[in-house]
Amino acid sequence: MNVDSDRLFTSWFYGLGNVYLYSKFKDENIITDRHFLSNFAWSGTEDNIEVYDLLVKKLGFPALTVILYANEKALFARLRSRDENDSDLDKVKKAKEKYEKMVFFCEKYEMPYMVIDPSELTPEQVVELIMKRIEGRA
């Protein structure tokens, strides 16, 4: 699916995953990975922005979106440690652009968000930062 160059198709395909998620867990508190932001970062274009407008209009958005930022060096090291031939290694050089698109999306739709660089943080510290934001302490 990720190799399909038809961005209108991929935006709908992954968007339908969000529709399914929201309908299956309606009125429940959930934590997801790869929400609208990832879909938009990889498939969003000027030609398909209406797809995202409709998804946000019909589904709303999370109470908080957390973007975990990592620089190219950290991303490359993480992926190589996972698998030296990881197919995602080629995507590392696009990371800065994708993070910028994610922030743009949050700001366009006025979604509450925060960006965290976990490079120097423990998982517990990352969770603490998120919890502070959720509880209104940050």
Name the predicted role of every residue range.
Residues 77-86, 90-138:
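NTP-dependent small-molecule kinase module
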Residues 42, 47-104:
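A glycine- and Lys/Arg-enriched "phosphate-lid" helix/loop adjacent to the NTP-binding pocket
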Residues 28-29, 62-63, 113:
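Conserved acidic residues
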